[in-house]
């Protein structure tokens, strides 16, 4: 028979709120299993007869029998005809047991790799699930046409059936890759075809892939100063050394790069709207950086985040579209243009990088959900995306003007608003 303390442990598990959703026999089975793993029940120790334990716990004998049967199937106990149930010999190696004289480990922080320690020390990219007031880069989601999205999703399910629920192409669903290529060619002047598009979950994933596939730990990469913190964190997590390059009213200054052209093998840019200042990289500087990348066989990582929201005139063509040398990787996302919960971003890649990048992403998370990809493809192809972006561009432009006016009026002398040409942030001086 159990010692009274062991019986009380089983009873406590039966009554604990954490386990109330489990069937009664599962609670008994897990309680006894934990006693074995903790070493409270040693190999060869007999278990009480099912009838006796049932009476002690106030449950039916069938319930205890079901618990014992599960423990036997898992290998925790042995059932012997005529001699009852005993703890199996194999549990001698269970994690909770200590050999004679073995020191007891004191709890504490787990030992991490240097890379893991660096990532933990640097913190995550998003720690606030609910955005704080005036937080930059947060899209408005209350105006999204949910009814249209739901209708398109039903169409996808009707056409594809269960195929929309299975594993998909690691490179991304072909209809979405084609829709993305058509869009960036038209709106951003890119050089894109469907077979050069890699669908991802976010721009953050794209930055991480660039860091790990293009460069080795210990190598250096040029970054804007100030830079988007998510990019810097992705590069540092991959073991890269970030070399800051100053930014002025025309964007990143190329002179420090051209003065030391071999100092780094890659450059990360936000040329459309630099984060956080919002300035746009001039055409002259774009061309100079493209030539630098060609001469040094370096890579340009172009993060074209929220380029859809340009409030003054036509935006300059993306760097990737100007680069005839195929040294630029273009990153885009639907996080800000649609909604963050969609979790779809993409890269437009040089042909030689499509295969290695696709393999690398498949090792991370396989692929994006097919249903969301196919629904988004219809949303874009049907003209809904363009219409929605135009409406949101007007809304954000109005809000930007209102905020700038109120800041100037209420905080004049303390803060000078710097109204950017585009984007979802407004810096101040």
Predicted stretch roles:
Residues 1-156, 352, 358, 362-369, ...:
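N-terminal basic, amphipathic alpha-helical segments
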Residues 153-297, 308-325, 329, 396:
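Conserved core of the PLP fold type I
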Residues 40, 75, 239, 304, ...:
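Conserved functional loop/turn residues at catalytic and ligand-binding sites
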Residues 48, 235, 257, 328, ...:
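Domain-scale detector for complete catalytic domains at protein termini or as standalone homologs
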Residues 139, 271-275, 336:
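Short glycine-rich anion-binding loops that position phosphate/pyrophosphate groups of nucleotides
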Residues 322-356, 368-371:
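Active-site PLP attachment segment
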